[in-house]
Amino acid sequence: MTLLTFRDVAIEFSLEEWKCLDLAQQNLYRDVMLENYRNLFSVGLTVCKPGLITCLEQRKEPWNVKRQEAADGHPEMGFHHATQACLELLGSSDLPASASQSAGITGVNHRAQPGLNVSVDKFTALCSPGVLQTVKWFLEFRCIFSLAMSSHFTQDLLPEQGIQDAFPKRILRGYGNCGLDNLYLRKDWESLDECKLQKDYNGLNQCSSTTHSKIFQYNKYVKIFDNFSNLHRRNISNTGEKPFKCQECGKSFQMLSFLTEHQKIHTGKKFQKCGECGKTFIQCSHFTEPENIDTGEKPYKCQECNNVIKTCSVLTKNRIYAGGEHYRCEEFGKVFNQCSHLTEHEHGTEEKPCKYEECSSVFISCSSLSNQQMILAGEKLSKCETWYKGFNHSPNPSKHQRNEIGGKPFKCEECDSIFKWFSDLTKHKRIHTGEKPYKCDECGKAYTQSSHLSEHRRIHTGEKPYQCEECGKVFRTCSSLSNHKRTHSEEKPYTCEECGNIFKQLSDLTKHKKTHTGEKPYKCDECGKNFTQSSNLIVHKRIHTGEKPYKCEECGRVFMWFSDITKHKKTHTGEKPYKCDECGKNFTQSSNLIVHKRIHTGEKPYKCEKCGKAFTQFSHLTVHESIHT
């Protein structure tokens, strides 16, 4: 009895085929192959881990595995054998025998092997229909690619022509002889000829809605699995489902690729190594940035300010900070950094000039009207299961859902608050549940959001990534830097409604308001004294505990107050920044300068209530009062 093996459900690509897949399609391929392997492993149909799976887990290019296996002398276990077996177990009738032979798929009879049905049933029971359909899409792509690159298609291929240019022209010349009439590629490409889009598939918006549909039919065999993956990911995002769970820590993820990346944290594996400094990294993106650091290379240049930047993400942020506002609303003149922001703004105007007579729906743009025409014509090539609306090309159910119910589709059942994004609703729910899933490993403090934990960790690491360009001072959080910048600009945006005083910080205004209300909500449990601010209570408690947290690194002396250690440090440095304008004498502390100035002014603010004698310093008054007692 021949049991089903991983080879029977695996798909392997050559280097040329792999290059035709974009990043999203390559990630989908990894997800599907890894899931197939796990399903086989769970029913005991495989024991040893194949080299392809190891390669995919390490995010290496899988075509290397195929080339290595061919070199090892196992041609009978190559791609063509696996492809035909995979088609049989999936029950595929989409590709006729002539097409399989043209693609070089040989070595297995068209009937299933004896004994294969039992193991196939176990395997397919674990696979979702979407995964099985995706495998078939990959096989169709592989078959058509082989046809396009066969000898009678490429014999007159010009040297300067690449695979992408040759694909549509060469496949139409002889695909009818290969039994592929059911794919309707000839009619689809004739529509593409009308738009002259043989080399530029990004100009789809210039074509009619009918041509859009035909272009999609062509793309069905080159990028059809991209639509499946995008729709599947959007549905998961909308429902909040996280089906992939880490067995080590219990954390769940929406995508299998996210789980794979996360598992590297537990294993400690770092597959990418920098040749300059020797550091290893888990992800390729992490690897690329340190290489730029070591070499000093800054390959990204901002066209706005001519700054050269090491990473593309920093370039994007630089453009935002540089005030690059490239998208302007023609109606109101408002400008935006991103096109999506302009689109949302235009939706807010509520003007919908385009109307479709079939259903009386109105649309903001004519492109939206064209999409509606295609939907009513029955050309629904992708479907959002949540909202039951069709999307004909590049579907975006998320935006559709937000527009469908007024822009904020996610509602809290506890307090009826509504949110535009599901992630915002998830964060909000933690207010009601009290959940704090993000915990600091150092001190055990927990937070509701990961960003808050990241900021907290900087307390332990001492990291201060935000620097003021004016004075060079560094800060732990971006908000602290924003508050600090007001000291340079003298901006005071916060005004007290009671007395009209203005403040630079909101926290300062909050503290000030308590002077009007007389509120002192913070009480000392030891002596019952009340304070307006929690920080004042914390400092006060040191009197009872005797805590002295501030230590001088020079002499080892400890102090209760931060201001005391600041003053003390000046005794080591000899710094005397406070100078008397009258006599030129310098002092380490401003309070000493104030007392000294009374010598010149003759001011004596401290008066004895017994005899009326006055003194320049409070300490002198205290000594004098002991005479009366």
UniProtKB/Swiss-Prot annotation:
Segments passing through the bilayer = none
Q: Indicate the cross-link positions, Glycyl lysine isopeptide (Lys-Gly) (interchain with G-Cter in SUMO2).
A: K383, K492
Where it sits in the cell: the answer is: Nucleus
Q: Where is this region: Spacer?
A: 76-243
Q: Name the InterPro entries on file.
A: KRAB, KRAB_dom_sf, Znf_C2H2_sf, Znf_C2H2_type
Q: Major location, coarse class?
A: nucleus
Q: In which tissues is it expressed?
A: Expressed in adult heart, brain, placenta, skeletal muscle and pancreas, and in fetal lung, kidney and brain. There is little expression in adult lung, liver and kidney.
Give GO cellular component annotations, separated by semicolons: nucleus
Q: Which residues form a coiled coil?
A: none
> N6-acetyllysine: which positions carry it?
K408
Which molecular-function annotations from GO does this UniProt entry contain? Answer: DNA-binding transcription factor activity, RNA polymerase II-specific; RNA polymerase II cis-regulatory region sequence-specific DNA binding; zinc ion binding
Function of the protein: May be involved in transcriptional regulation.
* Recorded family membership: Belongs to the krueppel C2H2-type zinc-finger protein family.
- Name-wise, this protein is Zinc finger protein 195
- What is the scientific name of the source organism? Homo sapiens (Human)
